[in-house]
Structure formats: C-alpha cells, structure tokens
C-alpha cells in the first residue's frame, strides 16, 4: 500500500511576484544535488490523524520555527502521486513577508543507514535549508511529482475555484 504524506506549500508575494517556499532534503544522498532535491514541507500521516493536521505538524517540525497563523482557510491543492508511488496531499498557506529567517530554521532529525547497506547509522536533518523560489524555478528543482502543486497554486490564486 502506498505511503501517504501531507504537507504545506507556503507562498508570498513580494513586489507583486509570487514565490513559494521549498525545503532542500537533508542527508548525504542529497548534499550535492539541486534538481529534484527540493520538496514542500511534508511528512507521513499518522494512522488516526487528519491529513491537514499532519501537514501543519510536519511543517512545524521540519522548520523548527513558528508557522504563520492561518488567517483564511488553507487552500486545498489536492493530491499528487510521486514516482515512488507515494501520495502527497497538500495545502497552501500564505506566509507574510519576509517569511522565515533561513538561519533560524532548525529541522528535526531522522536516523538513516549510511552508506547504504553498511550497517552504520547516522542522524541527519530531514531538511538542511529552505529558500523562496519563483514558480518557474520551483518547478525546475522540486521533486518531479510535486511540480503540479505549484501549477495548482498559481491557478487557484488567479481563480480560487480552480485549485483542485
């Protein structure tokens, strides 16, 4: 059965231009990669957990800084399927400028086996940095299966009835 994750795609406008916040995946496998190494803030939904609640929890855990208050309901971007088969349910939330201080972001850690099949385990941050991207640049660097979320956000901001 495919894993289901839930996440938040934060967005802001600066000088009238849309930007989205993406996180660079942590750990040695992703250290020197850019294209396909960025993701929305997301994580697995617990067995008895509401997907939106999981999305907010995961974003807070991965950023390690207070999230902006939901002043209007988060925008439901629907679900996408990544190449791995993982399903990602996402919402968008506006983050008023300037957004999180990248230096203040402190992700939680996960334990991985590294190098693979070595029997050795190391703790690595789930994400090692965050950055704001234009929609075009976001589509270039984000995990391929999540690019449609950026498209849906743009459509929804142009026409709120068009999100999913």
Which residues make up each language-model segment?
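Charged phosphate-binding loop/patch that engages nucleotide di/tri-phosphates or the phosphate backbone
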Residues: 131, 135-164
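Active-site-adjacent beta-strand/loop module that shapes the phosphate/pyrophosphate-binding cleft
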Residues: 79-119, 131, 153
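Residues that scaffold the ATP/ADP-binding catalytic core of kinase and kinase-like folds
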Residues: 32, 48, 141
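Short, charged/polar surface micro-motifs in flexible loops or helix N-caps
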Residues: 15-17, 27-30, 46-47, 84-85, ...
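The catalytic Nudix box helix
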Residues: 40-75, 134
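Alpha-helix-centered segments that form part of catalytic cores
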Residues: 120-136
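N-terminal strand-loop-strand
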Residues: 1-40, 91
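Functional cleft and adjacent loop/helix regions within the main domain
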Residues: 36-41, 47, 83, 92-93, ...
């Amino acid at each position: 059965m495919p894993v289901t994750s839930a996440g938040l795609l934060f967005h802001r406008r600066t000088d009238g231009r849309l930007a989205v916040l993406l996180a660079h995946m942590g750990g040695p496998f992703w250290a020197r990669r850019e294209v396909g190494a960025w993701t929305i803030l997301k994580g697995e939904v617990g067995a008895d957990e509401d997907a939106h609640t999981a999305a907010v929890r995961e974003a807070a855990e991965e950023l390690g800084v207070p999230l902006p208050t939901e002043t209007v309901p988060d925008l439901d971007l629907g679900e996408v399927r990544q190449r791995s088969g993982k399903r990602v349910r996402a919402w968008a939330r506006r983050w008023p400028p300037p957004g999180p201080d990248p230096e203040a972001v402190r992700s939680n850690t996960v334990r991985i086996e590294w190098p693979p099949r070595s029997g050795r385990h190391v703790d690595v941050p789930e994400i090692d940095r965050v950055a704001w991207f234009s929609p075009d640049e976001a589509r270039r660097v984000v995990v391929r299966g999540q690019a449609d979320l950026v498209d849906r956000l743009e459509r929804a901001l142009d026409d709120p009835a068009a999100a999913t």
